[in-house]
Amino acid sequence: MISTSSRKAKGRRLQNKVRDLILEKFNLHPDDVRSAIMGESGEDIKLSNSARSKFPFSVECKAQEKLNIWDSLKQAEDNSNSHTPILIFKRNRSKTYVTLSLEDFLDLL
């Protein structure tokens, strides 16, 4: 069984990876994107107004072996305010995936 500190570290690593990828992809300043502190309420990735204009999503990150996707999607939606909620998730030795509603996906096309 994984300890609480190991579980939080796993989640923190995913959040930091997502933060770094957003910074790189959108050529943002490091102060524009930060990973939430474990246990902090709201979105897992905190964005400045400048970052939000380039990346208009509210991010929930989950690094879990057995993910309850419905609870996780609800959490993403509850924390999204007026932004498009996305759930970024992975488990050990897997790719990282993103999920969002069909309507939000089609709006991107």
Model regions and ranges:
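Catalytic phosphate/metal-binding cores of nucleic-acid and nucleotide-processing enzymes, i.e., regions
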Residues: 1-109
